[in-house]
Structures are given as structure tokens and as C-alpha cells.
UniProtKB/Swiss-Prot annotation:
Transmembrane segment boundaries: 72-92, 104-124
Domain of life: Bacteria
Subcellular location(s) of the protein: Cell membrane
GO CC terms: plasma membrane
Native organism: Bacillus subtilis (strain 168)
Name the UniProt record assigns to this protein: SPbeta prophage-derived uncharacterized protein YomK
UniProt keyword annotation of Ubl conjugation present: no
Length: 148
């Protein structure tokens, strides 16, 4: 149920993960019925300027938290270091694969691919979450500017 009380509570108290889920549910990326959307915007418009400011700041913080560009630099460093560690662990020199280390090289490559795919999936998910937070932030900013 989307009403002013629920909205105020969720914007102030929900943890970021649950708040993103709430926003995605209430404002689906594929759109929704015009009247439903207009009713939800009216409910947001009923918030006070200080509540809007607080929500805007919270959305900016959540957007920043999920922004993959802020963590990808250190993440790539950790990934690269772990891949070198796996090479040592499995005794693999990718440039010199022999009959003796072929199985280890295969295991290394499979683990590396799995880790890269998992990382890519998480980056895409974080980007979607940052975009969701940014969407609501921009809507809140627009509503606040209309009030002034």
C-alpha cells in the first residue's frame, strides 16, 4: 500500500536494500498505469520541504553507495591479485601449459570465468540500484522545485 505514512516511514527507516526494492515495486522500470503513477506522485507532493530534502539526501547517499564506479578500481585490483594467487595455488603458468598442468590450468580458467561473471552480475545489479535511487532523487528534486 502506497500512502504518505508508509512513504515517510520507508524513506526514513528502511535499509538501503529494502528501500531500493520498495522503489522498484512502486515505480517499476517498465512503467505503470498513468492514474496509479499520478496518485503516487501526488502523495510525494504532499511531503513537506524538509521531508523532501531529507529524502533527496538519503537517495544521493544510496546512489553513491551502489555506484560501481566508486568501487571498481579497488575491485579490479583485488580481482587481479586473486587471479595471480590462483595461478600460484594451482601451479599454473598460462603462457606455459604442459601435459602435467593442463587440468590445473582448466580449473584455474573455469574459476576465473566464474568469478568474472559473478563480479559482472554484481556490477550490473549495483548499477541498476544506483539508477533506481537516482530516479527517485530526481523526482523528489523536481517536486521540491515545483513547491518553491
Amino acid at each position: 500500500m502506497f500512502n504518505k505514512k508508509v512513504l515517510k516511514h520507508n524513506l526514513a527507516e528502511m535499509n538501503p536494500k529494502e528501500l531500493i526494492k520498495f522503489i522498484k515495486h512502486e515505480f517499476p522500470i517498465n512503467g505503470q498505469d498513468y492514474h496509479t503513477h499520478a496518485r503516487k506522485v501526488q502523495i510525494i507532493k504532499s511531503l513537506s520541504p524538509s521531508e523532501l530534502s531529507s529524502a533527496i539526501a538519503r537517495m544521493e547517499g544510496i546512489k553513491s553507495q551502489y555506484d560501481p564506479s566508486k568501487t571498481w578500481g579497488i575491485g579490479s585490483l583485488i580481482l587481479g591479485t586473486s587471479f595471480i594467487g590462483f595461478q600460484v595455488l594451482f601451479g599454473v603458468n598460462i603462457s606455459k601449459i604442459t601435459e602435467g598442468n593442463r587440468l590445473n590450468a582448466l580449473i584455474y580458467v573455469l574459476i576465473t570465468i566464474i568469478i568474472c561473471l559473478w563480479t559482472l552480475r554484481n556490477i550490473i545489479k549495483d548499477k541498476e540500484n544506483a539508477t533506481t535511487a537516482d530516479y527517485l532523487k530526481e523526482l523528489l528534486i523536481q517536486i521540491k522545485s515545483e513547491k518553491n
